[in-house]
Amino acid sequence: MVTVNEFRKAQRAEGPATVLAIGTATPPNCVDQSAYADYYFRITNSEDKPELKEKFRRMCEKSMINTRYMHLTEDLLKQNPSFCEYMASSLDARQDIVVNEVPKLGKEAALRAIKEWGRPKSKITHLIFCTTSGVDMPGADFRLTKLLGLRPSVKRFMMYQQGCFAGGTVLRLAKDLAENNKNARVLVVCSEITVITFRGPNDTHLDSLVGQALFGDGAGAVIVGSDPVIGIEKPLFEIVSAAQTILPDSDGAIDGHLREVGLTFHLLKDVPGLISKNIRKSLVEAFKPLGISDWNSIFWIAHPGGPAILDQVETELSLKPDKLKSTRQVLRDYGNMSSACVLFILDEMRNASAKDGHRTTGEGLDWGVLFGFGPGLTVETVVLHSVPT
């Protein structure tokens, strides 16, 4: 008869959790940021607010975003005029859309990850689904299981209303699942659409306008597992460690509240300062055990909450301009897609590394960091190790 310790040892994987495939998806509707102020004020019937429109135009210009993708088309907004008001009761109509569309967009990203992975869907043992766009029972994880045709016994985890830091959270959870369950293959999906947050402008709530200028729709998916099957599975990044912390003196810096009017966001101007002031401590705690203290010697995947956050992090840590290249590229092409962003940046980095002839998936470097920032202020710090391209 085996002992408990022997049984537990046999249950666990030998190697570190590894990202084995990545997939991304967006709605087909692409929005030109340079024309968005005119469109937004027209579709929300707010042309009588020229000064506010000019403020919003400047926000869009400073966002460093070129394009975003949105499920909400002009036709859909005309069918739901309450979405275009500032604070109209509209949650039912918003929910009717997101409970269907969030899993569907997640499915598109998941299928691309599964195709790259190259193994049967029946080998997926766990599913982690994350969204800040609506809530439902059974959840989006259940709907995605049905849409993909996963085994009914797949072990599901549903994360609602976590916000922008959760792209790090899902990797932290996937790491623990993969390393503590031998042969586990974890499908991770983050799917976000702005149907739940879109609303018209108001000059007393400028932080809401900031969100209207930054947020876009997208879904990212990864498959995580330990001990890759040689010749079948292709490792992309190893997940070495993961930590979460609440920043000091940051209560109320980023808040989100689900109300009859949808999901409202409240942001303090000091968010970039709070993050940049505390980021060094998170880096030291994560990399001191590895003997790393040069932040330019690692590759960077940082949630692009907005250009001000990235600029202040660069300044605080004296980062070279190219350190946040992949992060800024995703912000430029897609905007802030909340939890899905860092998965898009992972994809951008491994693709750019191969295209540019780097020796590893991490821009030729061995070690890297993935940061998630969001409500709390909460910070997720994930240490990654790249693999040869």
From Swiss-Prot:
GO BP of this protein: flavonoid biosynthetic process; polyketide biosynthetic process
Keywords: Acyltransferase, Flavonoid biosynthesis, Transferase
Family annotation (CDD domains): CHS_like
GO molecular function, one term: naringenin-chalcone synthase activity
Active site: 164
Entry-linked InterPro entries: Chalcone/stilbene_synt_C, Chalcone/stilbene_synt_N, Chalcone/stilbene_synthase_AS, Polyketide_synthase_type-III, Thiolase-like
EC number: 2.3.1.74
Keyword flag Ligase: no
Catalytic activities: (E)-4-coumaroyl-CoA + 3 malonyl-CoA + 3 H(+) = 2',4,4',6'-tetrahydroxychalcone + 3 CO2 + 4 CoA
Root EC class: transferase
Pathway: Secondary metabolite biosynthesis; flavonoid biosynthesis
Top-level lineage group: Eukaryota
Database matches in PANTHER family: CHALCONE SYNTHASE 1 (PTHR11877:SF80), HYDROXYMETHYLGLUTARYL-COA SYNTHASE (PTHR11877)
Task performed by this protein: The primary product of this enzyme is 4,2',4',6'-tetrahydroxychalcone (also termed naringenin-chalcone or chalcone) which can under specific conditions spontaneously isomerize into naringenin.
Family indicated by similarity: Belongs to the thiolase-like superfamily. Chalcone/stilbene synthases family.
Protein name listed in UniProt: Chalcone synthase 9
Source taxonomy: Eukaryota, Viridiplantae, Streptophyta, Embryophyta, Tracheophyta
Chain's gene name: CHS9
